[in-house]
Amino acid sequence: MKELALWQEVQADLQQVEAELLRQVDAPDPVLSQAARHLVQAGGKRLRPAFAILAARCCGAPLERILPLAVALEMIHMATLVHDDVIDASPIRRGRPTVWARWGQELSLHTGDYLFARSLILVATYDDPRIPSVLASVSVKMVQGEIQQLAAAFDLDITLRDYLDRIYRKTALLIAASCELGAIAAGADTATIRHLRYYGRNLGLAFQITDDVLDMVADPEQLGKPIGGDLRQGVITLPAIYALQASPKKQKLIHLLGKRDKTQAEIQEAIQLIKDCGGIKYALDIAEGYLERARKQASYLPPGVARDTLTSLTYYIRTRGF
């Protein structure tokens, strides 16, 4: 992340998460172990373990209670990334070759499956039945979100409701679960668990919307991959949904977005049309609405540094560059 001051609140804890991640992904097979370690060492924001840790801190729980869960959440997230890269045939992620690009499809799929299976072992260390129950439900819905996205590829009739349902399943659910499960593992009361779940849900929706915006406007070096990846794959995101209704050059945009073999120049042209009619601003305004809802939920949490950090994260999400 923006190694901002607010993230320093959990930096030491995230270092322990990182060390435990590397320990957990070791496999008897050296190639599988190498592929899994490659994925961990590619880095990332580690948002999901951070949210679980901050949620637990709101409730006064030590890292020891939350560490297995925090690592499991990141492993589930990494498993989805490996599978995404296979589906999208993505050669680069976070500025490094993907597991798919380096080891091929079969090992990539096995690596994702292995990470998910290892996460189950960690989750099984908790006695509270709500923890595996929530994660099982979330995992099913995440897969449904991925299938929704595949089924809707190049579908220019996608609605705002369709889009929000897809990103809720694909992204927001796991962030909401990270907050909720951090509170459950910490022994929080029902109201605190609910506020943290809704905080994560709203922040997760805003995070994915801004991620979709960044795919059109970010610096490719900061992003770690070329921009326009969604348009190339036929994934119609919120800025494009708005532009398909509002652009004075709607027919041109329909032609560009509907093409299955776009050149980079055509992708850039489509992005410019989306920008020109206000698609980026519209999407960011929608994201800001969800961030405001997240701040409202955070205001109900016990006062302290953890709550302040959760609130500060809502402002970071809106202004991040990658």
Please give the residue ranges for each predicted region.
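All-alpha prenyltransferase/terpene-synthase fold signal
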Residues: 1-322
